[in-house]
Design a protein with these regions (language model features):
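Outer-membrane beta-barrel architecture
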Residues: 85, 104, 161-163, 177, ...
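Outer-membrane beta-barrel domain signature
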Residues: 74, 130, 174-176, 225-230, ...
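Periplasm-facing N-terminal accessory domains of Gram-negative outer-membrane beta-barrel systems
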Residues: 1-52, 95
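Face-selective signature of the C-terminal outer-membrane beta-barrel domain
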Residues: 242-260, 275-366
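Structural signature of outer-membrane beta-barrel domains
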Residues: 60, 110, 120-122, 167, ...
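Periplasmic N-terminal accessory/gating domains of Gram-negative outer-membrane beta-barrel systems
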Residues: 26, 37-39, 59-150, 161, ...
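Residues that define the transmembrane beta-barrel architecture of outer-membrane proteins
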Residues: 81, 156-158, 181-185, 233-235, ...
């Protein structure tokens, strides 16, 4: 043991042998015969000769996977689980705050991420105000995220691609759940349409923020004051169908529909209304010949509609609508158990429309 000044005290019967050692120094032994005589111990440097060291490393692939188990491990924001919140916990992906559903991959913008289901792009990943994403993990809980090294079949986005695989449902029995959150509630169910053959999974979510806001606005005594609460409501429905026609054929379908509405009353004479609707749907089939090759073709559609109206001293309004039709076909052949080649094609037609509100000549487009 040592005292407060760092001096060691050792107890032993004389004569005794003391050993002194330290990292990078040679061990020294000293035989103590007389405790009254001081002595000095000098440790000599020890040289460790190492053989050549080769350090190797492999580049980390810019691809990761998400699962239902991983999503359930993160805290629920406003009582809702979210696949994008889970992705924000992985390396290279962040979000600005807990109420922002967007993700930022390696410093890029959130609008530079492509969201797909079965390799088909969807209309919009989040609701109007950005509180929550449109993805319900009850159905959309497995995905492949490409942060770099994008496959050649993807284009148009710079940061990442999130390809989600909808839950096929349960072909044996029915199961479901009802969730109650701080801002919304949902009814979820999955089960067989044809037992052992065709299954489905469906989720319907609605908010009650607008009800709280309406009750508050009715309680405002002075309707001329600008202290009204915005009345915001969102709804979404997600449906997935999976059917195994035979050992060679498999058919799937997916649909996602959202409705958002925001009403802001500044005073008794001025009111703003915004509406936002989106729809994404696709259906496709896989054919697997006896040699293990895969033929996959898919048809999809996506659309988004927004409309705004302002009632007051200067009424104005407008809206826009865009939609796309996409068709894809791909053939995959594997050989030597390690290599595969893909060949395919893609067709897409898109249209964007915008217009003023037709009932007033002085309206300006917003």
């Amino acid at each position: 043991s040592s005292d407060s000044t760092g001096y060691f005290e050792l107890a032993c019967e004389v004569p005794c042998t003391l050993e002194f050692s330290h990292v990078n120094y040679k061990k020294e032994s000293y035989t103590l015969k007389d405790t009254r005589s001081p002595f000095i111990v000098i440790l000599r440097n020890k040289f460790n000769n190492l053989r050549e060291v080769v350090v190797t490393g492999r580049s980390t692939p810019g691809r990761l996977y998400s699962s239902k188990e991983g999503i359930e491990m993160i805290p629920a924001i406003l009582g809702e689980q979210d696949i994008l919140k889970y992705l924000a916990t992985t390396p290279g992906i962040i979000t600005t705050n807990a109420l922002d559903p967007g993700i930022y991959v390696r410093g890029s913008n959130s609008c530079e991420n492509g969201f797909l289901t079965h390799d088909m792009e969807i209309a919009s990943p989040d609701h109007l105000t950005g509180i929550l994403s449109t993805f319900d993990p009850f159905i959309l809980n497995n995905s492949t995220v490409y942060k770099s090294g994008f496959p050649a079949v993807y284009n148009s986005y710079l940061s990442s691609y999130i390809n989600m695989r909808p839950d096929p449902g349960n072909k044996q029995k029915y199961e479901g759940e009802i969730t109650l959150g701080l801002v919304s509630s949902a009814l979820k169910i999955k089960g067989p349409l044809v037992r052992d053959h065709t299954s489905f999974a469906a989720s319907f979510r609605t908010s009650y923020l607008q009800t709280i806001a309406r009750l508050y606005n009715k309680s405002v005594k002075d309707q001329k004051q600008q202290n009204f609460m915005p009345e915001y409501a969102f709804n979404d429905a997600t449906v997935s169908i999976d059917s195994k026609l035979s050992n060679r054929w498999r058919v799937t379908a997916f649909g996602l529909f959202t409705i958002d509405g925001l009403s802001m009353k500044l005073n008794e004479n001025v009111n703003y209304d915004f509406n936002w609707h989106t729809f994404s749907g696709n259906a496709g089939a896989w054919y697997t010949p006896a040699n293990g090759d895969i033929l996959h073709f898919r048809l999809g559609v996506k659309s988004a509609f927004s409309e705004g109206d302002a009632e007051g001293t200067i009424p104005m309004g407008g809206g826009n609508r865009n939609y796309s039709i996409i068709a894809r076909i791909m053939y995959t052949h594997s050989f030597l158990d390690k290599f595969q080649w893909n060949i395919g094609g893609k067709f897409e037609q898109a249209r964007f429309e915008t217009a003023n509100r037709p009932d007033a000549e002085e309206n300006i487009l917003i």
